[in-house]
Every structure is written in structure tokens, then in C-alpha cells.
């Protein structure tokens, strides 16, 4: 029996014309189907830590740069509007 072509009829679903199956003696349910939620809390903790560990630099470095820029800007603004910084404020605003 060759590969199916337009002129070859293999049969309907379940009756494909092949040899009968033999030797199936038992049926089992997959262990994944029996315990679908096994280990979710353990895996959630360690997977969350792994994800955090691999991503925290992508957040921490830009946040640190922004915080440094914001802190220096506030200090400079407080200096400009103090008694000691009035002269520089007049020079900057020209």
C-alpha cells in the first residue's frame, strides 16, 4: 500500500485499512493530568526570584540615573532661590 494519492481511498477515521492494533492491555492517566497544580507555590517563589534577578538591573540603573538627576536638580533649584544663589539666578535668566 503506497502513499495516499487522489485515487487511493484509505478509509474513514478509525478504519484506515492498516493492521489491527494488538497488545494494548492497560490505560493510564498521565501524572500531569492527575496533579495539575503540583508544586505551583514552590515554583512561583523560585521562578519569581529568578525573573527578578535577571531583570532588576534594567530597572535599577535607569531609576538610579533618574534619581541622581532629580536630586541634583532640586538641590540646584534650592540654591538658586536662596540668598547665596540670587546672583547666579540673575545670570542664568538673562
UniProtKB/Swiss-Prot annotation:
Residues 2-49 are mitochondrial matrix. The keyword Transmembrane applies. Its main location: mitochondrion. One of its GO terms (molecular function) is ubiquinol-cytochrome-c reductase activity. GO terms for cellular component: mitochondrial inner membrane; mitochondrion; respiratory chain complex III. Belongs to the UQCRQ/QCR8 family. This is Cytochrome b-c1 complex subunit 8, mitochondrial. The gene is QCR8.
Amino acid at each position: 500500500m503506497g502513499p495516499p494519492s487522489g485515487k487511493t481511498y484509505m478509509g474513514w477515521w478509525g478504519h484506515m485499512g492498516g493492521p489491527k492494533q494488538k497488545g494494548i492491555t492497560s490505560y493510564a492517566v498521565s501524572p500531569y493530568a492527575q496533579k495539575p497544580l503540583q508544586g505551583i507555590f514552590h515554583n512561583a517563589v523560585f521562578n519569581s526570584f529568578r525573573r527578578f534577578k535577571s531583570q532588576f538591573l534594567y530597572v535599577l540603573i535607569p531609576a538610579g540615573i533618574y534619581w541622581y538627576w532629580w536630586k541634583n536638580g532640586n538641590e540646584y533649584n534650592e540654591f538658586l532661590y536662596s540668598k547665596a544663589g540670587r546672583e547666579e539666578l540673575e545670570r542664568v535668566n538673562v
